[in-house]
Swiss-Prot record:
NCBIfam families named in the record: PRK05610.1 (NF004123), uS17_bact (TIGR03635)
GO function terms (MF aspect): rRNA binding; structural constituent of ribosome
Source organism (scientific name): Anaeromyxobacter sp. (strain Fw109-5)
Keyword set includes ATP-binding: no
Protein name in UniProt: Small ribosomal subunit protein uS17
Highest classification ranks of the organism: Bacteria, Pseudomonadati, Myxococcota, Myxococcia, Myxococcales
Function: One of the primary rRNA binding proteins, it binds specifically to the 5'-end of 16S ribosomal RNA.
């Protein structure tokens, strides 16, 4: 069940060492304000992974959700691509 317009991001899992939590790195491209060159910026989000299904390197979609802990405000919506083993 979808609850209104929630933000979503696509990123890569960089850590899965915590219980039911993964760290997802989301890269975006922005233009430098002065010179206009396109540069990559990255942000890391802690996301809830109920089944501990994600592995490092998986490409996932995360969506906003209620606060689950001090840092965790996102959850895994779907796994888009599994990592090569």
């Amino acid at each position: 069940m979808e609850r209104g317009n929630r933000k979503s991001r696509i990123g890569v899992v960089v850590s899965n060492k915590m219980a039911k939590t993964v760290v997802v790195k989301v890269e975006r491209r922005v233009a430098d304000p002065k010179y206009g060159k396109i540069v990559k910026r990255a942000e890391k989000y802690k996301a809830h992974d109920e089944n501990n299904a994600c592995q490092i390197g998986d490409k996932v979609r995360i969506v906003e959700t209620r606060p689950m802990s001090k840092d965790k405000r996102w959850r895994i919506a779907e796994t888009l691509e599994k990592a090569e083993v």
